[in-house]
Amino acid sequence: MIKSRIFKKGSSNGLSLTEVGFGTAPLGNLYKPISDSEANSALEAAWKSGVRYYDTAPLYGLGLSETRLNRFLRTKLRDEYVLSTKVGRLMKPCGESNRTGHGKWFEVPSRQEVYDYSYDGVMRSIEFSYERLGINKIDIAYVHDLCIFTHGSKQASDERIRQFFDNGGYRAMIGLRDQGVIKAIGGGINEWEVCENLAQKGDFDIFLLAGRYTLLEQEALDTFLPLCQKRGIKIVTGGPYNSGILATGAIEGAF
């Protein structure tokens, strides 16, 4: 069975995360459609293997991932798992031709992503996630994709970070944690440099570093991970095998 590690940071809001978690982007029909039964079978297999940490986001399948996770988690006791989702995007209904992610998300609701890192945007995002997930408690909220990879340039990334702090998004997350609505706050980010920037600007508990701390990419060891260790900030590594290049060799289009 997969082991658990206790996560505590200066409070009684302890979280026990299994060493392996389940990232649910593929449940949102990422790059190819899968059926509800296939999604549930994957979740059940992970559960039987001991996985008790599940991460999702409104972006994943434009809400489909959260909805599918709802169907699975409603069969489990709430105190048996840890659940994280993300804020920073709202999903607005639209016509199919205008929806987000043609060629990336398949057979998903007709919704358009709207970036919103404001106070109201964060609060509404959490409320909508509660509705899609069908639960009364989210453990971890990550601010999603404040990164260069998503926004196209460092200047654009810095502007989104400014909006997050100046327009109340950060304040909303702190308030949700202080009120006990969520237990921990952090960032779900593609670049360690952006995570480091956030860690220097705010009081975060945890970062989900997606695909940028692997056997091949070790730069985060220089300054970012020591900073997290000093401040007691925990790290979840998303996609630790990344493209799988160490197993397959170099292939065209690997990222």
Language-model regions: role of each:
Residues I6, E38, L146-F255:
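Beta/alpha (TIM)-barrel catalytic core signal, keyed to glycine-rich beta->alpha loops juxtaposed to Asp/Glu
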Residues P33-A46, S118-R132, N190-N197:
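Short, acidic/polar
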Residues C94-W105, G249-A254:
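Short, flexible, mixed-charge acidic loops at enzyme active sites
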Residues Y130-Q155:
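Active-site groove signature of glycoside hydrolases
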Residues M1-E96, K104:
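N-terminal binding-site loop/beta-alpha segment at the start of enzyme catalytic domains
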Residues A25-L27, A57-L59, K86-L90, V143-L146, ...:
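Active-site beta-loop-alpha junctions enriched in small/polar residues
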Residues F22, A39, A46, Y54, ...:
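Conserved, mostly hydrophobic/aromatic
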Residues A25-S37, E107-M123, D158, F255:
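Active-site mouth loops of central-metabolism enzymes
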